[in-house]
């Protein structure tokens, strides 16, 4: 018995049997050990043969394995186990019988199937099969069928891995047609595939198209048509096998093993005489698959059979991979006929979604509204870039269904958030109880109040949730019961059991329908749980994927949008024209009436330095995203050379940094809903503006890697100082403001090309700030200082006289508002810093800033009795206290420190 004359599979089985015997402490290696090793191989031919011999019973191999394990336990064992485990006489006889069968077959190596035939003649193995309820004669017959009608020979050490190669390395799509999703449309593509398959030679279609357009679905549609008989007679009885290239390559550790597997597949296809069609998804993998030194790739094994028409093969690949791999091999390409699968239109996608609706409803246990399917197709086409219909629309529906299912099976988000907040406050409550300082005691009172309010809010919500959950669970149970009864009804109708049919149809089923209708009619308004997937759920998923707010506007959103201009004015002093232009553009976009193929708004802001051009862009980003840092800021002074355009859109192929993408395109691709600020735009090279033309016109830009970036949900703001000197001259009275504005526009038209200016929504000229407006700016800057002081528990009070001093010492009409900030930082913040370090200012005190007696300096006074938190009452004061020169008016800034952090009050600052 020379192991070199055994196949790899046989040797592996003998080694595994030896390990089983050693671990069990058995003195000899018996046929039982060998059968146990072969039965443990889940994909082995013994399990296949037993399953088929018992009429396709999947549990029969496991039953046999249990019987063999029981028999092994009865064998005598030694402890400690013996050093060597020799083969028993019975096993040697089995191998000799197998070798004699091998010689009759003409095999060069002893294969596993011959070894099994030898094992079946052993009485102990036959008894085990009988005990498991399997006929040994049938198992023998199934093993002999494995090699096919012609009795294929094993001529190499890996020859026995290729029995039933199609079953091992592929799956029959015709067999699985009932489990596949229904294919809607694609009739023209399926007909073209059928026509190509019916040719005499080169009868191999290749489906090419973008990822996600439904190439594989065309083949699944063909499989379903074959099952229905809706194909020409030459395709009626064919098997459509999807070849798994990964399984073919996986585990092929010996040279030539991959080619041997593939040849076995092709031989089975050839023997089927046209009754097998291969489907290879990602067919470009065939080119180069298995190629190593001294071996050929899979494509060269396919070519002869493809050309002669002996092999009918359907391929599928994307346009890019077809061009990259297949077109390079002209001999391989000419054997295939191209079938282009185009992206379906939105109406076609809606039809596809309607066809898939039942499958997704059944899987998730939810109900999908038809309007949700329409919205999924429309929103995915409009907002999700870089992917294709119907794939992205199907994914939207799937995720929306999954969200609803998860919400049904878990606590509503509202209750969950309140529970988390309650736990957080309880932890804070326990921590503050141990503190003795004034601020902690004041905060403790506040935490107790918040906890009481939270518990009052949480209790009714929890009760409502439990009631709704019970109702939905009851409806689901009734529906499952109805499905079971309908199945029983169909069975009774087939058996012609009319009494049972009448009993079910007019008794049990009617009762269940009445119960379901009653429970569904109990649904009130403002439900916490919903088992319906509607347009809102789809829009929510789109918003989560893209960051674009496409959800239906809530009451808070409506109030925010209507008051957007007022809230921008709280931060930007003056400039009513610019603020209203930006606010109106955002309003149009969020109402859904903006132009669909252009950015939300595109503006050119003109005016002298320090009047609020950049500040307005930051304020808009803060209002839209609650964070002014979510602003895509491009400083155009960095783009003064022609080659710097590549930094915006990404370096072209072959240049350093090609893989990194552009500074503008990458940020917008990640956050399509953003405010883009091109600062100091007149300083950029003219070539930069050429790239912006298509952004302003079509809302799209192609980056250095050929990807289209969507700018349709961005607000584009350009700022420039062109002609600022004319506006300043108009302000001091040398010209009228109208003449100054005309001069600015002339300057702009000289510098920028007409095609750029013509694409902008609005060119807004910012006026220089008046003395009164600069006072408001000074107050805003002092408010910023007050915020920093409030973090240390210090309140700040500033008189109007102090603001007048600040203005008189810092005002410069040429530079606008920026000198005020510089002066406050240099004088006021420096003085306050000195007072903090010298411990003149302490926690819970108020700093009063007033004009000094000689009017060109500021006077500072500290009151230790005030501060943010009154030590006696525990009440909080405003962080910036306005002290006018005349009678006291209301607070200028209704802002308070909450949890020792600054929380902006919604009312903001009262305008004078």
Curated annotation (Swiss-Prot):
Protein origin, superkingdom: Eukaryota
Repeat 1: region residues: 6-75
Keyword Metal-binding recorded: no
Region (II): 533-724
Coiled-coil residue windows: 406-502
Family the entry assigns: Belongs to the ClpA/ClpB family.
The protein's name: Chaperone protein ClpB1
Taxonomic lineage: Eukaryota, Viridiplantae, Streptophyta, Embryophyta, Tracheophyta
